[in-house]
Amino acid sequence: MRKITIVLLSSLLIIALGACKNATPQVENGKPALMWFDAEANFERFSNPDSIDYYLTKIKSLGFTHAIVDVRPITGEVLFDTEFAPKMREWHGYERKDFDYLGHFIKKAHELGIEVHASLNVFVAGHNYFDRGLVYSTHPEWASIVYTPEGITSITNEKKKYSAMVNPINEEFQTHILNVLKDLVKRHPDLDGLMLDRVRYDGITADFSDLSRQKFEAYIGQKVEKFPEDIFEWKK
């Protein structure tokens, strides 16, 4: 879905560039205009600083005021240096040379008068379409346990769902993601802000792990006798 969106946005951008050659774009009523730079869809495109410079200059000419740079896609890998998470160095067979990706975005954007906000997907750590990410490589215990019509299973088994969400109540993951966030702002204090996505449970089917049951029973002060049916029940 994101790839389709990026292709559509790219087409609209090309059309807009052709229409605006001799015009000075104006931001409506001083409202911010945001351009989103997806991590996975643009991995090869933004593989060198010159490409970043080119697109930032283009969006500036179109009147955009903010660049939203995706630095933690749904795999849980990141696009900045940190000791707390693996760095995404390859996507779909393309290996990116090592450079300060986010740092260059910030430097060039600020030269152009554009704000930079880093975007991070929070309670997710895997891509189910490619069996890739932290819940596949190192931390399967972080994956959300979902209650489906077929029974209780790991979200990594739901191959029609691309985001392998984690259990937000998992304290080990909470420590992990907080370390990632704190290290990001420590390393890049000139960031203008953060945008946090997927700060939630996967949905009504999550989370039905033993951990969630224990935490819920401690919260209400009694045992759940029929689990998961006392929470909700699928009807055929």
Annotate each predicted stretch with a short phrase:
Residues 33-37, 67-69, 116-118, 194-196:
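Hydrophobic faces of well-ordered beta-strands that scaffold small-molecule active sites
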Residues 74-121:
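Aromatic-lined substrate-binding rim segments of carbohydrate-active enzymes
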Residues 29-46, 118, 123-188, 231:
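Active-site-adjacent "subsite" loops/lids of carbohydrate-active enzymes
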Residues 59, 67, 109, 177, ...:
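Conserved, mostly hydrophobic/aromatic
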Residues 18-19:
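C-terminal motif of bacterial Sec signal peptides marking the signal peptidase cleavage site
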Residues 51-77, 189:
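Catalytic domains of carbohydrate-active enzymes, especially glycoside hydrolases
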Residues 79-91, 124-159, 198-235:
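Aromatic- and acidic-residue-enriched segments that line the glycan-binding/catalytic groove
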